């Protein structure tokens, strides 16, 4: 799972595939609270020694704590990435266009075909369509081709010591140690992004503990090497964040003429991460119809009474349902969620 953080009023999407500063997108599912680094922080060696003591106090075995933490040195590249300003800004439309290339869509469709039987079993268990699972897999790690090369314990210890979001990364480090204690992977093989997002789904360690599953039945929740575990874990995460089986995520719509002023009277949400607060309060489809909202082709909206929120992202408007918010739970940025959902639609041939 990608990790986002606030920088200069915008939001940085950080995952194994790199960084992009997305204007108008929101914080991630695990928003990292900013803090102020202490000028009198201990040396890295002293800090890690205290982490080791605290980890053992939390029930982590001495063997795991020693294997993961002994002789660690800070990763300067991690500190630089954490502090860096992105060098370019992408709009939502640019973000989507740069990722949803014809070649990438074909690759995603091929992956869905290759794993069709597995994805059907996963959908039967978790209610999440295989097209959506493959879309997340593709955007997070290019279908498992690149899931990060940074040693996760070292990266998290560095970020915890660096201090600006120290408590968050300290807790993630303890979660990583719990994973090592579980025996899912060795310390040397626990690799991920500079921010500690791990494996092919790019889960933070705490998300691994909450959502990773052993779908191949080998006794380990292996999101690094086991394709069944990877894809099922993505589905389980989305299910746990509210994905409703058989429902769609939303649709592009047309808001033109008098409808522009009419919809402006609908208030925005007042709770949730930034991306959620950029959604309108929900209204029934027939209410949006009366306000002048139409399908992207200019036709009447469906007559269903389900509720939807209006979203203006880039140059387009969308009516989005609860399932869209489940995708925001993976990474709370509209550029990300719209890329995922539109890729899933293209995989399904819509």
Where in this protein do the model-derived segments appear?
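Bacterial N-terminal signal peptides that target proteins for export
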Residues: 1-15
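Bacterial N-terminal signal peptides
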Residues: 13-24
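An acidic, Gly/Ser/Thr/Pro-rich helix-cap/linker signature
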Residues: 31-123
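Acidic helix-start/capping segments at beta-turn-to-alpha-helix junctions
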Residues: 65-89, 137-141, 151-153, 252-261
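Solvent-exposed loop/turn segments at secondary-structure junctions
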Residues: 73-74, 140-144, 197, 255, ...
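Acidic/His-rich structured neighborhood in mature extracellular/periplasmic domains
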Residues: 92-233, 239, 249
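Ligand-binding pocket segment of bilobal, Venus flytrap-like solute-binding proteins
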Residues: 220-280
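C-terminal soluble interaction/assembly domains
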Residues: 259-350
């Amino acid at each position: 799972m990608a990790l986002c953080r606030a920088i200069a009023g915008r939001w940085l999407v950080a995952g194994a595939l790199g960084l992009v500063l997305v204007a108008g997108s929101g914080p991630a599912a695990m928003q990292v609270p900013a803090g102020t680094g202490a000028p009198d922080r201990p040396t890295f060696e002293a800090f890690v020694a205290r982490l080791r003591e605290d980890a053992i106090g939390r029930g982590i075995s001495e063997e795991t704590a020693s294997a993961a933490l002994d002789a660690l040195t800070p990763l300067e590249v991690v500190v630089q990435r954490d502090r860096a300003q992105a060098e370019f800004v992408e709009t939502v439309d640019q973000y989507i266009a740069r990722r949803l290339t014809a070649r990438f869509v074909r690759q995603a469709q091929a992956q869905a075909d290759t794993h069709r039987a597995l994805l059907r079993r996963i959908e039967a268990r978790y209610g999440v369509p295989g097209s959506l699972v493959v879309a997340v897999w593709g955007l997070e790690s290019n279908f498992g081709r690149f899931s990060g090369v940074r040693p996760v314990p070292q990266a998290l210890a560095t970020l915890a010591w660096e201090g600006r979001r120290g408590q968050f990364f300290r807790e993630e480090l303890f979660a990583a140690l719990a994973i090592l204690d579980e025996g899912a992977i060795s310390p040397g093989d626990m690799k991920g992004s500079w921010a500690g997002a791990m494996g092919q789904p790019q889960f933070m360690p705490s998300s691994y503990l909450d959502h990773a599953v052993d779908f191949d039945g080998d006794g380990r929740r292996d999101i690094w090497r086991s394709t069944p575990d990877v894809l099922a874990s993505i589905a389980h995460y989305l299910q746990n964040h509210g994905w409703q089986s058989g429902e769609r995520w939303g649709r592009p719509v047309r808001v033109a003429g008098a409808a522009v002023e009419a919809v402006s009277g609908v208030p925005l949400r007042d709770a949730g991460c930034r991306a959620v607060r950029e959604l309108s309060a929900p209204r029934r489809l027939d209410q949006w119809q009366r306000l002048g909202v139409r399908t992207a082709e200019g036709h009447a909206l469906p007559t269903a009474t389900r509720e939807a929120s209006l979203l203006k992202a880039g140059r387009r408007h969308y009516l989005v349902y609860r399932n869209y918010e489940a995708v925001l739970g993976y990474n709370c940025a509209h550029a990300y969620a719209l890329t995922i959902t539109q890729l899933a639609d293209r995989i399904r041939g819509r």
